[in-house]
């Protein structure tokens, strides 16, 4: 298969192919333009993969540009986080990082040009009055009483805005287009507003700041962007994008193309709702492993490869749809099944004593790090007479479908011996505290000599060598597929989205590195937490289970 045949195909790539074939463009230049007012989420990952992926595949360029036109909501913390996320996903921007604020001088000049052409005016209606005058989808707007000011008056008033002569909300610059337009975005949109706030890039140089719709198209043109890719909610804004560029003296006119945004089940991606989750402490922060943020997914144990594969699988269309969470989980499960080394950890431990094993002694059992990849090597795991097993792996009585340890019956310990449960010890409440067993000494990693069949296999950890670990069982943040549609999305937070257990792990995990994934055999995929784990306090996050338990629960 050729490189071209291996590329994904979608309507945007078809447009690019045609543009290159006809000579409309000789190269491809895209951009990823986030506003630095929050952390990136999985929806942004789709746009990152699209814009940077196209530039990569067509040997073009992709800019990282911060749409930093609202100093009140933006912070350098978000700038650094976004840069880190883009790089972590495996992409590199062309040249230096760009900022819309780099172009504030040019943007101001273009605003003055529109005023000189009679296409912009200073309006002194209040924000509420502007909304009232704008009309509705069913009713046209009406002209502002300030709409017909002279060019000279507008120039003077705009300079007064720039020099701080108006209070916030007392004046703005509006485009003069058509208050009766069927498209509300074209009803004399605001181009500049007043904000007395220090900007993280320009300091206090400006007290007027351009709006997104005015800034975005001009920034694209100044950077020589050939294909400006936006999500579908900006479809109507394309009319304003083109109007601005058509009415200023700028030689380049990029084209905007829209694609569907990513909607994902069992989460929300509204920045307002995500911020509410954080500020009201329903989650631990923007990087909480239950959040759909890239930093949250990374902390949970998702790999950049799995997120890129997910974005590739869902594709790029113009049709809005909601993607099943199982699709994202499947991508990380496949990745980690292929690449994660194996280890043993007991999440809900109960003591098991092998009475006929030499007491006080131990031996090393050799275990493969991956059952299908001998090149990943092996490790030695200590075994002794007292071990921990998972409480769910033992029953006093069970039917034939139960393939684990049952009183009076046998089971194999993973890569070790066959044992038989002989008796149990219980506390005053009737809870099993210890299981007493015997072992067949001639069954270390082999079948019994007499040919008897032992079907079940369970994992274990030597009690004398076990590492105490905190295990955080993360699950979907919401209990319904579309929490955003609920009257109160906070009311459908999944109460089981985080369950914390105290368990034991094999000693090799003392060397675990933050973020490195492991398959805890028979349990799921886990990684060492980057926030809470220390050398003396090991905390592991569940990335995803071995199988989709939500699908089974819904059947």
Swiss-Prot record:
Positions that bind ATP: 35-37, 41-47, 231, 261-262, 269-271
Span(s) of short sequence motif 'HIGH' region: 34-44
Chief location bin: cytoplasm
UniProt-listed Enzyme Commission number(s): 6.1.1.18
A matching Pfam family: tRNA-synt_1c
Taxonomy, superkingdom: Bacteria
InterPro entries: aa-tRNA-synth_I_CS, Gln-tRNA-synth, Gln/Glu-tRNA_Ligase, Gln_tRNA_ligase_bac, Glu/Gln-tRNA-synth, Glu/Gln-tRNA-synth_Ib_cat-dom, Glu/Gln-tRNA-synth_Ib_codon-bd, Glu_tRNA_lig_a-bdl
Residues noted as binding L-glutamine in the record, renumbered to the chain: 67, 212
Residues spanned by motif 'KMSKS' region: 268-272
Record key words, sorted: Aminoacyl-tRNA synthetase, ATP-binding, Cytoplasm, Ligase, Nucleotide-binding, Protein biosynthesis
GO BP term, pick one: glutaminyl-tRNA aminoacylation
PROSITE patterns the UniProt entry points to: AA_TRNA_LIGASE_I (PS00178)
Any one annotated GO CC term: cytosol
Catalytic reactions on record: tRNA(Gln) + L-glutamine + ATP = L-glutaminyl-tRNA(Gln) + AMP + diphosphate
GO molecular function annotations of the record: ATP binding; glutamine-tRNA ligase activity
Record localization: Cytoplasm
Transmembrane annotation, as ranges: none
Ranges where the record places region Interaction with tRNA: 317-324
SUBUNIT field: Monomer.
Family listed: Belongs to the class-I aminoacyl-tRNA synthetase family.
Protein name: Glutamine--tRNA ligase
Source species of the chain: Klebsiella pneumoniae subsp. pneumoniae (strain ATCC 700721 / MGH 78578)
Organism classification: Bacteria, Pseudomonadati, Pseudomonadota, Gammaproteobacteria, Enterobacterales
Gene encoding the protein: glnS
């Amino acid at each position: 298969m050729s490189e071209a045949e291996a590329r994904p195909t979608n309507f945007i790539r078809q447009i690019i192919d045609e543009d290159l074939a006809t000579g409309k463009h000789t190269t491809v230049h895209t951009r990823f333009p986030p506003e630095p007012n929050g952390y990136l989420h999985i929806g942004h990952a789709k746009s990152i993969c699209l814009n940077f992926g196209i530039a990569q595949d067509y040997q073009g360029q992709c800019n990282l540009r911060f749409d930093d036109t609202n100093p009140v909501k933006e912070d350098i913390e978000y700038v650094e986080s976004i840069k880190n996320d883009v790089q972590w996903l495996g992409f590199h921007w062309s040249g230096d990082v760009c900022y819309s604020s780099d172009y504030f001088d040019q943007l101001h000049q273009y605003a003055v040009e529109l005023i000189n052409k009679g296409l912009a005016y200073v309006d002194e209606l209040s924000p509420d009055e502007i909304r009232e005058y704008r009309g509705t989808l069913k009713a046209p707007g009406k002209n502002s009483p300030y709409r017909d000011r002279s060019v000279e008056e507008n120039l003077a008033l705009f300079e007064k805005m720039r020099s701080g002569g108006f209070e916030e909300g007392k004046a703005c610059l509006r485009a003069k287009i058509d208050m009766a337009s069927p498209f509300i975005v074209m009803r004399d949109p605001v181009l500049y507003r007043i904000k007395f706030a220090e900007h993280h890039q320009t300091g206090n140089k400006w007290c007027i700041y351009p709006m997104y719709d005015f800034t975005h198209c001009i920034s694209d043109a100044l950077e020589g962007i050939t294909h400006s890719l936006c999500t579908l909610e900006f479809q109507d804004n394309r009319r304003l994008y083109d109007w601005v560029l058509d009415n200023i003296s700028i030689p380049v006119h990029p084209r905007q193309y829209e694609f569907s945004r990513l909607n994902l089940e069992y989460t929300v991606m509204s920045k307002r709702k995500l911020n509410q989750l954080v500020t009201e402490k329903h989650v631990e922060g923007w990087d909480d492993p239950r959040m759909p943020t890239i930093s949250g997914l990374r902390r949970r144990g998702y790999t950049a490869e799995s997120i890129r594969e997910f974005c590739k699988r869902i594709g790029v269309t113009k049709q809005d749809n909601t993607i099943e969470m199982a699709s994202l989980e499947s991508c990380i499960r496949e990745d980690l099944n292929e690449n994660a080394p194996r280890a043993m950890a007991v999440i809900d431990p109960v003591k098991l004593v092998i009475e006929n094993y030499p007491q006080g002694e131990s031996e090393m059992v050799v275990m493969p790090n991956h059952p299908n990849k001998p090149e990943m090597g092996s490790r030695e795991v200590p075994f002794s007479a007292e071990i921990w097993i998972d409480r769910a792996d033992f029953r006093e009585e069970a039917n034939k479908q139960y393939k684990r340890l049952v009183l009076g019956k046998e089971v194999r310990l993973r890569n070790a011996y066959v044992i038989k449960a002989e008796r149990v010890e219980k506390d005053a409440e009737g809870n099993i505290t210890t299981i007493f067993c015997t072992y067949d000494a001639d069954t270390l990693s082999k079948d019994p000599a007499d040919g008897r069949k032992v079907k079940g296999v369970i994992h274990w950890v030597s009690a004398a060598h076990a590492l105490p670990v905190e295990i955080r069982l993360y699950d979907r943040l919401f209990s319904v597929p579309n929490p955003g549609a609920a009257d109160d999305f906070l009311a459908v937070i999944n109460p089981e989205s985080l369950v914390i257990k105290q368990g034991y792990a094999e000693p090799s995990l003392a060397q675990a590195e933050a973020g490195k994934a492991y398959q805890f055999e028979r349990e799921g995929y886990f990684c060492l937490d980057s926030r809470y784990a220390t050398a003396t306090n090991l905390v592991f996050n569940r990335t995803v289970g071995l199988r989709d338990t939500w699908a089974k629960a819904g059947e």
